[in-house]
Amino acid sequence: MLELRLVQGSLLKKVLESIKELVNDANFDCSSTGFSLQAMDSSHVALVALLLRSEGFEHYRCDRNLSMGMNLNNMAKMLKCAGNDDIITIKADDGSDTVTFMFESPTQDKISDFEMKLMDIDSEHLGIPEAEYHAIVRMPSAEFARICKDLSSIGDTVVIAVSKEGVKFSTKGDIGSANIVCRQNTTVDKPEEATVIEMNEPVALQFALRYMNSFTKATPLSSSVTISLSNELPVVVEYKIAEMGYVRFYLAPKIEEDEEETKPQA
């Protein structure tokens, strides 16, 4: 038996909005410690890892480890029916091929339940090794989203370069080029508006902007984003979910030679 009750139901809606563009079908894994998901995007370039810890739920019951295959677009459609202030409960019986979403208004004068068929999804769990990163940048998530959006009007790729001067985002395309530099600033009164850079050695890596723009769909989940870079590893773009866990996106850097074949189709 699985029963999870989340008072801040809008959180689940935001989580789904942040990942449904990248991943169509995925297994949600429930255990005694939390509700998680790990899935590759359809082109096997990006990986999404989600964790919602059990202690972040008002009520969390998971009698045994359970994997529930769901179509994320269908799940998002159901969650759209919940009001932003609604309490969301997710229920599934052992051996059942359906999951139930229950939405309660805060005054409890309206209760809706939606049942969705589960899917059989073959998915392999990729071991994500803990790594030491050459550079870690923490910055306001809205600023990162704006930079990715602005640069994608010029080019298809972004070079993220971290040095003593700060973090530089640059692109070039048919109409010209653009560089945006963010310097470390920790003196601001509001810590969530700070840009903090930890660097062991300089790093410069190139990534497809369409993926970065997709990752920024998670901006509503957190006021800051952490970008971890190392020359031989995928970048990690992490949005912490207050008191509960995180959404992490992993993306392999682009190598110059494969630039042509990975260009998005017009």
From Swiss-Prot:
One of its GO terms (biological process) is translesion synthesis. It holds the Pfam family PCNA_N. One of its GO terms (cellular component) is PCNA complex. The keyword Nucleus applies. This protein is an auxiliary protein of DNA polymerase delta and is involved in the control of eukaryotic DNA replication by increasing the polymerase's processibility during elongation of the leading strand. Belongs to the PCNA family. This is Proliferating cell nuclear antigen. It comes from Pisum sativum. The lineage of its organism: Eukaryota, Viridiplantae, Streptophyta, Embryophyta, Tracheophyta. The gene is PCNA.
